[in-house]
Amino acid sequence: MAAEWGGGVGYSGSGPGRSRWRWSGSVWVRSVLLLLGGLRASATSTPVSLGSSPPCRHHVPSDTEVINKVHLKANHVVKRDVDEHLRIKTVYDKSVEELLPEKKNLVKNKLFPQAISYLEKTFQVRRPAGTILLSRQCATNQYLRKENDPHRYCTGECAAHTKCGPVIVPEEHLQQCRVYRGGKWPHGAVGVPDQEGISDADFVLYVGALATERCSHENIISYAAYCQQEANMDRPIAGYANLCPNMISTQPQEFVGMLSTVKHEVIHALGFSAGLFAFYHDKDGNPLTSRFADGLPPFNYSLGLYQWSDKVVRKVERLWDVRDNKIVRHTVYLLVTPRVVEEARKHFDCPVLEGMELENQGGVGTELNHWEKRLLENEAMTGSHTQNRVLSRITLALMEDTGRQMLSPYCDTLRSNPLQLTCRQDQRAVAVCNLQKFPKPLPQEYQYFDELSGIPAEDLPYYGGSVEIADYCPFSQEFSWHLSGEYQRSSDCRILENQPEIFKNYGAEKYGPHSVCLIQKSAFVMEKCERKLSYPDWGSGCYQVSCSPQGLKVWVQDTSYLCSRAGQVLPVSIQMNGWIHDGNLLCPSCWDFCELCPPETDPPATNLTRALPLDLCSCSSSLVVTLWLLLGNLFPLLAGFLLCIWH
């Protein structure tokens, strides 16, 4: 499968637009058809140019530009795999702030938010448990390391500024300067102590708009790379993306191309780089390339990068058919990591294929850093943009083989009673994971799970998705409600007729053309007098959303709730049909549904104390006592008044 790379980017208006995802069955286009119809013939023909953008020359950063073995606070990498989405913290350089207003708005409020949102949803990581605090560069690029000390010590002085590519790293993201000035250890830290760092992030991306030498000599929109790697798994934790200011276009027709370019470049920084091949790990966390005592692989000075082993990249010779019925030898480099081999064999239906071929043309930066264009044409990580870039399973496999980014191709929540509801991938319908237990073990090739929560290991072969033609791969699936065998409604949020009955609408949901599926953080509760009701099937629901200059708004009844950032918890408390509905919703990304969104911020503090008017059906004991006391005090007065009249 291939995920749409450039389209489906966000929509204006009060409701959601089309899905951000589209799937196609092929990674490349086999032919080009020029369809000419409905046009008046002219005396002259219109020339058609079939070309490609200039090749991507990914600059593998030099040894002096990258800091390895960066010590992070706490145990930054958890050894077990946890299904959590990649979190990228975007930090904009002052050069972005100095762009023309329309370019600045495009970069900060549309281009990078959409690209980052896409990548965060696509990749998962081993969850970190600490704060990213980057190492300082040294003034002379010379440093020492002490045994059993995770820090590095600059010989002489630390650099006045630490850079990530061309972008200066903010001081608050840096560790304290540590120096060695000769003599005996210990030598200590000097200057400003450790700063705050970056919490709740797996990767920090510094975005600049600097007119660098590369911008003046190469016809490029942007370029990106990594700059610091953590000590445990050699994972890039910081990188940069620089936009050439003169190449930033605000023309709507050029946005899709720029968006696909930014995604392509950020993937280079995350792991698809020849400079990182030697740092790939296997599924157990072991390096695929042997290391020296200092923890680093051998350095290849002729290539200017760390030398990978043949467990990652292998050189092979092909027999090459050319003209005059001749066969020549053709040397290629194959990426041979396990998941890449598996996906390449599936894609080309070739069970003996050794790996996926890397590009061998285009010069330094294009060669070895991309897939072979001849084989994967418009795949996202080929070396030039020709048409409609798509991200294939082969690139996803490579990112998983880095040992850091992982993919979760299926859901793992058992379908049971009560149901644990979720959202369909496009967030347009309530869904349920169709994972179930079968009466007999599934065929070996369809047994996907090494573990499932609450399921004994000996029972795992019995579990898979309910749809056989999907290879028993469980996925979140739309469903319908039935009563006594009769169809009632479906879970598609956009269909008004799916609106639940008033007294069954526990979550205060609203179905209609402007509604989307939102995750419920907690089960909704209906309260009235001393009665409390909740529905056992919960986890998601349909709610109306709208776009505003302030951001995405979620509507429950006639009350709007502003989403300041994705993942924000919205405490909901509304009155509907004489009942109080209480619950919590999770905010989606504004970019999932809106064309323009403001920068994400922390929500303002709110007073969550509920002030409700008195309900006529109230069963408050204090109110009952008060009424009886009032009647008791009035009775003697009334009796005296009647006696006076009698006499």
Swiss-Prot record:
List the expressing tissues: Expressed in all cell lines analyzed.
- Localization terms from the record: Cytoplasm; Lipid droplet
The terms under GO molecular function for this entry are:
metal ion binding; metalloendopeptidase activity; peptidase activity
Keyword annotations of the record? Cell cycle, Cell division, Cytoplasm, Hydrolase, Lipid droplet, Metal-binding, Metalloprotease, Mitosis, Protease, Zinc
Q: Where does Zn(2+) bind?
A: 264, 268, 370
Task: Give the transmembrane ranges.
Answer: none
Q: Which GO terms describe its cellular component?
A: cytoplasm; cytosol; focal adhesion; lipid droplet; membrane
Q: Which InterPro entries match?
A: Peptidase_M8 (IPR001577)
EC number from the UniProt entry: 3.4.24.-
Q: Which residues form the active site?
A: 265
Asked if the record carries the keyword Cytoplasm, the reply is: yes
Cystine pairs annotated here are none
What does this gene product do?
Metalloprotease.
Would you tell me the protein name for this molecule?
Answer: Leishmanolysin-like peptidase
Which species is the source of this protein? Answer: Homo sapiens
Gene (name only) = LMLN
